[in-house]
Design a protein with these regions (language model features):
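Membrane-embedded alpha-helical bundles that constitute the cytochrome b-like, heme-associated redox core
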Residues: 1-111
Length: 111
């Protein structure tokens, strides 16, 4: 196993471990939010703790997804052009989602 493959494997394992409590937290939070009024939801979603967890979850989740998809493309896509286009599509998707979430957090913070 090369050095970069080992680093990728280690990051995949640690990010998946980090996502377990984050996903659990957000599943519980969604159930709690479903029973709240609109004003209570806005209050909860505006808390710094919640916004930080949203950013952490988004960043770790997107990096984990990106690495996983890169591994799948590396293993199953053999055409050079298709591989480059797939990598570009993944990177654009990740950048777009991260941009939307970051902008949402900023707008919630300044509100």
């Amino acid at each position: 196993m090369s050095h970069s493959a080992r680093k990728t494997w280690i990051f995949q394992k640690y990010s998946s471990i980090a996502l377990i409590p984050l996903v659990s937290y957000f599943l519980v939070k969604i159930l709690q939010l479903s029973k709240m009024t609109y004003d209570q939801i806005i209050f909860e979603a505006s808390s710094l703790w919640f916004l930080v967890l949203v950013l952490i979850f988004t960043i770790i989740g997107l990096l984990h997804m990106r690495l996983g998809l890169h591994e799948v493309i590396e293993d199953y896509v053999h055409s050079g052009m298709a591989k480059r286009l797939s990598y570009a599509a993944i990177n654009l998707f990740v950048a777009g989602i991260l941009g939307v979430v970051s902008l949402s957090v900023i707008l919630i913070c300044i509100k």
